[in-house]
C-alpha cells in the first residue's frame, strides 16, 4: 500500500466526519453536541488517521523485533498517559473516576466488597454471592478478575486500569501475529499500527467495564487457535491454552465463547488438506465437539440456551421496546432491517440526545463506521483472489458474532459491537493492502452513503422523540 493511497484514504475519512458533524450541527443546531464532545470526537478521528498515515510508512520496513518494540511501547505509552488523564478528567467532570454511573461503579463496588471478605478469610460469603449473582456466569469473569486485583492491591482503580493498558498494548502484537500469519506481512503491520491508534482501544483503558479484557481474550484465543493449526505443533500446552481462553471468555460474554468454538470448527473444515489432513480434521473436530459438550453440560450450557432463545426468538425486541416508550419509527429497528448494516452499525451519534458514554466515543464510532467498508471489501477481495479459506477463522468469528448481536436486544449498543472492532481493522488492513484502483469507485460511493446515513441516523434519533 503506497504512502499516497493511505494518505488519501485518511483525508477522505477526516473529510466525511468533519462534513457530517458540521451539517448535523448546523441543521439541528438546537440539539447539536456540546463543544466538549465535538472536541473529543475531532481529536479521536484526527488521532487515528493522522498518526496511522505518518507512522505506518516509517515503520513498515523495520526489522521484526524493532517493529514489535515500536508497536508495543508506543501503544503502552499512549494508554498509560490516557489512564492518568482520564482518571483526573472524570474525577473533575463527574466527581468520581468513572465515565458513567452505570456498570462501572457496580463492578467496582461489588469487587471491593468481595475482596474485603476474602482478606477476612470468609470464602463462604464469596461463593454464596457468586451463586446468587443475578447477572449469571457470563458476568463472573470480570467480577472475579477485579476482586483478585483489589484483594492484592487494595481498592484503588489504578492497578486495574494499568492492567487494561498492558492488555491493550499487547493486543496490538497479537493482532499483528494473527493478521500477518493469515494475510501476509504488509497486512499484519498495517493492522498493528491501526490497532495502536484505534481510539476505542485506548478509551477502554480508562473505563471500569469488561470490554477491554473481553476483547483481549477473544483475539488472543483466535490467534492461538490459528497458531495451533498453521504451526502443526500439537503440544499439550498449544491445545489446552486456546481451550482455557475459550472457557474464560464464557465468563465475560457467553456469545464470545460460542462464536470462538464455531469459528474454530469452520476453520478446521475449510482448511486445505496441505494445512490439515483428513485425519487431522477428524481428530480436531472430535476434540472441538468434546469441548463443546463439556461446556454444554455445565452452567455455561444453560446460558448458551438462553442466548439462543434471546437471539432467535426475540428479533423484534428493540422495535417493541421503542414502541412502548412512545418512540416513532420503531419498525426500523427490527433485526431484518439492521442485518445488512451489521459491520457498520451503530452509526456515530452527533446530537445531544445520546448517552454521555456514546458522546465520548462518537469519534471512535465513526472510525469503525468508516473502516467497515474495507472490512466488507476484504471478503470480496478474498473471494476474488481465491484465498477465502485462509480467511475462514476470522470471518467465521466476525460474521457469527455480528449476526448474533444484530438479532438480539443489543444491536443498537456500541458496547456490544466493540469486540468486533479489532477484526474490522484486520480485515480492513487486508483490503487496503490488496485493493485495486477500480475498488476506489466503490469507496467513493461508500463515503457518500456514509455521509447520508450519518445525517439520517441522527435525524431519526431526534424525530423518534418528536423533537424535529
Q: Model-found features: residue ranges?
A:
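Short acidic/glycine- and proline-prone juxtamembrane loop motifs at membrane-interface regions
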Residues: 206-214
Amino acid at each position: 500500500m503506497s504512502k499516497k493511497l493511505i494518505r488519501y484514504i485518511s483525508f477522505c475519512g477526516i473529510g466525511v466526519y468533519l462534513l457530517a458533524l458540521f451539517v448535523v450541527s448546523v441543521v439541528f443546531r438546537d440539539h447539536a453536541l456540546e463543544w466538549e464532545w465535538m472536541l473529543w470526537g475531532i481529536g479521536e478521528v484526527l488521532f487515528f488517521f493522522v498518526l496511522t498515515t505518518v507512522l505506518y510508512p516509517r515503520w513498515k520496513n523495520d526489522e521484526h523485533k524493532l517493529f514489535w518494540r515500536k508497536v508495543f511501547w508506543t501503544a503502552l505509552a499512549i494508554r498509560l498517559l490516557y489512564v492518568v488523564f482520564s482518571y483526573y478528567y472524570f474525577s473533575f467532570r463527574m466527581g468520581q473516576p468513572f465515565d458513567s454511573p452505570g456498570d462501572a461503579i457496580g463492578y467496582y463496588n461489588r469487587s471491593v466488597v468481595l475482596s474485603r471478605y476474602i482478606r477476612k478469610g470468609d470464602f463462604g460469603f464469596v461463593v454464596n454471592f457468586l451463586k446468587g449473582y443475578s447477572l449469571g456466569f457470563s458476568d463472573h469473569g470480570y467480577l472475579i478478575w477485579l476482586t483478585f486485583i483489589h484483594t492484592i492491591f487494595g481498592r484503588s482503580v489504578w492497578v486495574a486500569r494499568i492492567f487494561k493498558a498492558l492488555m491493550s498494548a499487547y493486543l496490538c502484537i497479537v493482532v499483528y501475529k494473527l493478521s500477518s500469519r493469515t494475510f501476509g506481512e504488509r497486512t499484519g503491520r498495517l493492522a498493528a499500527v491501526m490497532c495502536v491508534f484505534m481510539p476505542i482501544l485506548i478509551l477502554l483503558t480508562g473505563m471500569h467495564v469488561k470490554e477491554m479484557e473481553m476483547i483481549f481474550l477473544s483475539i488472543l484465543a483466535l490467534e492461538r487457535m490459528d497458531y495451533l493449526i498453521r504451526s502443526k505443533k500439537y503440544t499439550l500446552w498449544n491445545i489446552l491454552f486456546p481451550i482455557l481462553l475459550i472457557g474464560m471468555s464464557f465468563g465475560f460474554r457467553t456469545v464470545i465463547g460460542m462464536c470462538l468454538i464455531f469459528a474454530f470448527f469452520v476453520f478446521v473444515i475449510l482448511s486445505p488438506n496441505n494445512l490439515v489432513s483428513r485425519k487431522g480434521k477428524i481428530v480436531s473436530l472430535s476434540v472441538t465437539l468434546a469441548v463443546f459438550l463439556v461446556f454444554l453440560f455445565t452452567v455455561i450450557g444453560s446460558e448458551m440456551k438462553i442466548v439462543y432463545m434471546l437471539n432467535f426468538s426475540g428479533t423484534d425486541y428493540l422495535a417493541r421496546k421503542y414502541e412502548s416508550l412512545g418512540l416513532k419509527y420503531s419498525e426500523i429497528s427490527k433485526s431484518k432491517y439492521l442485518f445488512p448494516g451489521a459491520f457498520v452499525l451503530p452509526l456515530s451519534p452527533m446530537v445531544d440526545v445520546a448517552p454521555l458514554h456514546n458522546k465520548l466515543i462518537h469519534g471512535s464510532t465513526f472510525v469503525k463506521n468508516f473502516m467497515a467498508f474495507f472490512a466488507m471489501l476484504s471478503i470480496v477481495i478474498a473471494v476474488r483472489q481465491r484465498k477465502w479459506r485462509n480467511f475462514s477463522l476470522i470471518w467465521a468469528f466476525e460474521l457469527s458474532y455480528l449476526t448474533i448481536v444484530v438479532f438480539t436486544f443489543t444491536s443498537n449498543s456500541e458496547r456490544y459491537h466493540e469486540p468486533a472492532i479489532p477484526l474490522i481493522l484486520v480485515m480492513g488492513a487486508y483490503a487496503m493492502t490488496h485493493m485495486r484502483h477500480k475498488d476506489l469507485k466503490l469507496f467513493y460511493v461508500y463515503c457518500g452513503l456514509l455521509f447520508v446515513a450519518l445525517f439520517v441516523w441522527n435525524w431519526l434519533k431526534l424525530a423518534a422523540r418528536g423533537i424535529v
